Amino acid sequence: AEVQDKGEFLAEGGGVR
């Protein structure tokens, strides 16, 4: 759960979105 592209990493719990 790292800052990949947007703030959706914390919402999705995934990778690059």
UniProtKB/Swiss-Prot annotation:
Transmembrane segments: none annotated. The keyword Secreted applies. It comes from the Eukaryota. It is found in: Secreted. Keywords: Adaptive immunity, Blood coagulation, Coiled coil, Disulfide bond, Hemostasis, Immunity, Innate immunity, Secreted. The keyword tRNA-binding does not apply. Conversion of fibrinogen to fibrin is triggered by thrombin, which cleaves fibrinopeptides A and B from alpha and beta chains, and thus exposes the N-terminal polymerization sites responsible for the formation of the soft clot. The soft clot is converted into the hard clot by factor XIIIA which catalyzes the epsilon-(gamma-glutamyl)lysine cross-linking between gamma chains (stronger) and between alpha chains (weaker) of different monomers. Forms F13A-mediated cross-links between a glutamine and the epsilon-amino group of a lysine residue, forming fibronectin-fibrinogen heteropolymers. One of its GO terms (biological process) is adaptive immune response. One of its GO terms (cellular component) is extracellular region. A long coiled coil structure formed by 3 polypeptide chains connects the central nodule to the C-terminal domains (distal nodules). The long C-terminal ends of the alpha chains fold back, contributing a fourth strand to the coiled coil structure. Cleaved by the protease thrombin to yield monomers which, together with fibrinogen beta (FGB) and fibrinogen gamma (FGG), polymerize to form an insoluble fibrin matrix. Fibrin has a major function in hemostasis as one of the primary components of blood clots. In addition, functions during the early stages of wound repair to stabilize the lesion and guide cell migration during re-epithelialization. Was originally thought to be essential for platelet aggregation, based on in vitro studies using anticoagulated blood. Heterohexamer; disulfide linked. Contains 2 sets of 3 non-identical chains (alpha, beta and gamma). The 2 heterotrimers are in head to head conformation with the N-termini in a small central domain. This is Fibrinogen alpha chain. It comes from Sus scrofa (Pig). The lineage of its organism: Eukaryota, Metazoa, Chordata, Craniata, Vertebrata.
